[in-house]
Amino acid sequence: MPAPPCASCHAARAALRRPLSGQALCGACFCAAFEAEVLHTVLAGRLLPPGAVVAVGASGGKDSTVLAHVLRALAPRLGISLQLVAVDEGIGGYRDAALAAVRRQAARWELPLTVVAYEDLFGGWTMDAVARSTAGSGRSRSCCTFCGVLRRRALEEGARRVGATHIVTGHNADDMAETVLMNFLRGDAGRLARGGGLGSPGEGGALPRCRPLQFASQKEVVLYAHFRRLDYFSEECVYAPEAFRGHARDLLKRLEAARPSAVLDLVHSAERLALAPAARPPRPGACSRCGALASRALCQACALLDGLNRGRPRLAIGKGRRGLDEEATPGTPGDPARPPASKAVPTF
């Protein structure tokens, strides 16, 4: 049976049926609709003002690749300039290939690229070194705790180096729905109260962040990359399989099978969520060591690095779990091997 005509142009044959709306579109019309929806998200949310210098968190994966491609196409209409900022976490056999994809993208799209490395920023620590230090727990999920916190700090540092005024990341609707589920399952009222918006305004001197793909499903991100023939890196991080996010992802897939709108329902619910004032987190202060935003004496990054340098990474994870990155999980303090004493906690 031949494919129906495209519901938009009526000239070409439809190449896909949009997962949520059911609309049959050709590849060109789907890509145009996808870009228009991202443009609407940016304009309606007033995410990127004219003249903004935007640091795109570039990982080489499908989401950041699609985000960079779409924003590059929209940049003249938005009046913004783009800088690619990639983070080298120091994961052997994984990150090198991903960074190679980012470099190809930067060359093809003629966008400036800056790479910042954990090893340079965090006193010699790489994710492989962190994994060896936390190996006593017998689990890899704590690696995602460290990596999420440190990557956020590294992206901020890279954005400042290039003179950016805003940071954008490629989180899509599925990512956000998983985060809502994770925070709900943990009973993390603070993150539920503040995590549903399109980004953060940049309190305490931090750069404003936003997620222009927040309402785009993962399926459509993949379809856009396919029709635009984008070059991206698709392997999963070697430390990801045991992360708590994987359980939320499995649950979300089951929910979506029963209710196709489950992903966007969760995203919109998080937007509308209004918890009692008593449940909202206090206004953050400043880290006593590096000056970054912090709800305690030390920010997340300094607390984790402090635990690593003292040889007590599991204690660093367990002590303020709800204040850590969304991959954080309860930990049992262990006695991992002590890293070299020469690795000092850096001053940012």
UniProtKB/Swiss-Prot annotation:
This is Cytoplasmic tRNA 2-thiolation protein 1. It is an enzyme of class 2 (transferase). Residues 316-348 are annotated as: Disordered. The gene is CTU1. Keywords: Cytoplasm, Phosphoprotein, RNA-binding, Transferase, tRNA processing, tRNA-binding. Plays a central role in 2-thiolation of mcm(5)S(2)U at tRNA wobble positions of tRNA(Lys), tRNA(Glu) and tRNA(Gln). Directly binds tRNAs and probably acts by catalyzing adenylation of tRNAs, an intermediate required for 2-thiolation. It is unclear whether it acts as a sulfurtransferase that transfers sulfur from thiocarboxylated URM1 onto the uridine of tRNAs at wobble position. InterPro entries: CTU1-like_ATP-bd, CTU1_C, Ncs6/Tuc1/Ctu1, Rossmann-like_a/b/a_fold, TilS/TtcA_N, tRNA_thiolation_TtcA_Ctu1. One of its GO terms (biological process) is tRNA thio-modification. It comes from the Eukaryota. One of its GO terms (cellular component) is cytosolic tRNA wobble base thiouridylase complex. It comes from Homo sapiens (Human). Component of a complex at least composed of URM1, CTU2/NCS2 and CTU1/ATPBD3. May form a heterodimer with CTU2/NCS2. GO terms for molecular function: nucleotidyltransferase activity; tRNA binding. It is found in: Cytoplasm.
